[in-house]
């Protein structure tokens, strides 16, 4: 049996832009994607700390060092620039893998610059 486990998150990031006219997804600074080991087009959950909204989408790469967290498409109705969010990724793991999994927690500052990596 495989289990779906939390494996990484970008914690308390600030939404920098919202674009209703974009097809969909969330644009994330590539430095943060790398730190969290989230791939382009990987499914992510976004939990809005500011207003409680939650959604599923997929990750797109933003310019390195830009701090961009861009909410695109219909999701822009749920999240606005300035909102604080958690972006989380999950994966399927065997029982053995799940028991030793050490999720990555990427902490950022107010400008979405990497502060540190912490174990979950």
From Swiss-Prot:
Kindly list the places in or outside the cell where this protein is found, as annotated in its UniProt entry: Cytoplasm
* Disulfide bond positions: none
Needed cofactors: pyruvate
List, from the UniProt record, the residues annotated as the active site of this protein: 25 (schiff-base intermediate with substrate), 58 (proton donor)
> At which positions is substrate bound?
57, 73-75
Post-translational modification Pyruvic acid (Ser), affected residues: 25
Give the PANTHER family listed for this entry: ASPARTATE 1-DECARBOXYLASE
What name does the UniProt record give this protein?
A: Aspartate 1-decarboxylase
Organism expressing this protein natively: Deinococcus deserti (strain DSM 17065 / CIP 109153 / LMG 22923 / VCD115)
């Amino acid at each position: 049996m495989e289990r779906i486990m939390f494996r990484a998150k970008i914690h308390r990031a600030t939404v920098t832009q919202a674009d209703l006219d974009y097809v969909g997804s969330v644009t994330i600074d590539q430095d943060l994607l790398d730190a969290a080991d989230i791939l382009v087009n990987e499914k992510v959950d976004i939990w809005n700390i500011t207003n409680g909204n939650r959604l599923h989408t997929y990750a797109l790469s933003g310019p390195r060092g830009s701090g961009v967290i861009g909410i695109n498409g219909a999701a822009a109705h749920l999240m606005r620039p300035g909102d604080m969010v958690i972006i989380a990724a999950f994966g399927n793991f065997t029982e053995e893998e799940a028991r030793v999994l050490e999720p990555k927690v990427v902490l950022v500052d107010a400008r979405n610059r990497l502060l540190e990596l912490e174990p979950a």
